[in-house]
Amino acid sequence: MVAPSNSSFLSSKWASRFLQSAIIQGAVITFLTVLFISIQLLLSSSINIVQFLSLSFEGPAKWIFLGYIFYMILIVSIATTAVFYNHFEVNMQRIIRGFRSVLAWVHLIGMNVGGATVTLTMIYAGLVGSGIMGIIMSGGNNAVELKPNTQVLEQFIIPISIFAAILVIGLIAGGLTFLLSFLGNMKRFENKVQQA
């Protein structure tokens, strides 16, 4: 069925912003995956990085896996958030503007800057703490001397905490945006019922 030419399709600018950021974050994790695979292919004659990481999951290497998994969860969360903004702006016809727009910007920045930085820092901390970064930087020459260093992880606690706080602030701002949009629509619905 073809829509009439004079109809206008409603769109959500906030849903578009969150979907675009999810696509960008997806490109980042794809690049990171290709980078890991390329490094493994280059160093395959000297060490099997994937095998080493899977055998040393108890130590700092788990930060690599957790950061990677959390990054993928973050991408899905950003894309899912777009559905909520679309519902508010298109279905409920609640334009996000004014104070709610400021909250939505904090939400977008908090999720993308705070969330992405937390997960990427966790991945980097795992690479450094597990000793894999040393192998990569030396071209795979010191595979015999590979030893995890848990003490190096202490320097990542404060940056991870700061960016986790930015993420939480963004999520709280997003929750407030959702709540204000929903309650505003409820008031409008109650006014229509009272007028009828």
Regions found by a protein language model. Name each.
Residues 1, 89-96:
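Glycine-centered secondary-structure boundary/capping sites
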Residues 1, 195-196:
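Intrinsically disordered terminal tails
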